[in-house]
């Protein structure tokens, strides 16, 4: 999309199965703005601004809404981190307000805040429908001349004299001066084809969905990192997602060839400690039923940083992967800056 926007329209996108399959289709779609560095803050801020305008450009709804977000701190160390990040975010024009516990009650009154020492409120944070965002970007790219082919699996990377020269597919070769590995949780395998190390691995990622909550409205996204959880409204229900410290690796012997819009076997025993914390944090959950326990794969990197840029092993072979479950939040900015990176060279 961004290459075409910059005038480079001789671009082909190859998708092994269907667009949004793998992880995008089940992503939570949180679009925050407060990150731990200037570059990342700028990147995710751009994503939100892009998603806000995509529908007008493409005619496809992205489901993007600026609901605001609240991040709760249950200790002073966490609150200090929020204050530091808030100061950084303000440099890039991101409105971040540090609130007292009493002020937080006005934002998330149905949360138990007894042990909360403060928090961060970001009015322009939001959420989107990940699949719709992906399809809107695809339509925008096609409108500008990009060709997109589904059900085409890449089987090899062509190279010569230390530079990439194209890709091998099930249906033949495509010559190309530049190749970008956006393979998601398959990016490590695609990298191997090129002799490029892409250190990431899929983990099981869980979320719960409650029954409908009367009068819930469009609540802010709520993050409680000290309990490894986030909360958002989802069609009148509460979705509780987990980022547990001891995650479960998935597909250590390889991702199944036919994996597409698939779900992984759930593990209630693994999730129960976090579900109990969630019920304490949101007391109304005790009277609600849990309609869904979802388990799907997300890829993570060893240092929790993105894998983005030109590979050191092979010239003109770029990587954009390993977004550690915030791919929707990062995608707009990552696409923009990687496209500019490619063109600048």
Regions found by a protein language model. Give the residues of each.
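Short beta-strand to alpha-helix junction loop
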Residues: 38, 42-45, 71-81, 120-143, ...
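Dinucleotide-binding Rossmann-like beta1-alpha1 core, especially the glycine-rich loop
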Residues: 29-107, 226-231, 235-237, 258, ...
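Glycine-rich FAD pyrophosphate-binding loop
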Residues: 4-25
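Helical element adjacent to the flavin cofactor pocket in flavoenzyme catalytic cores
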Residues: 119-178, 182-189
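Central helical "cap/lid" subdomain
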Residues: 169-218
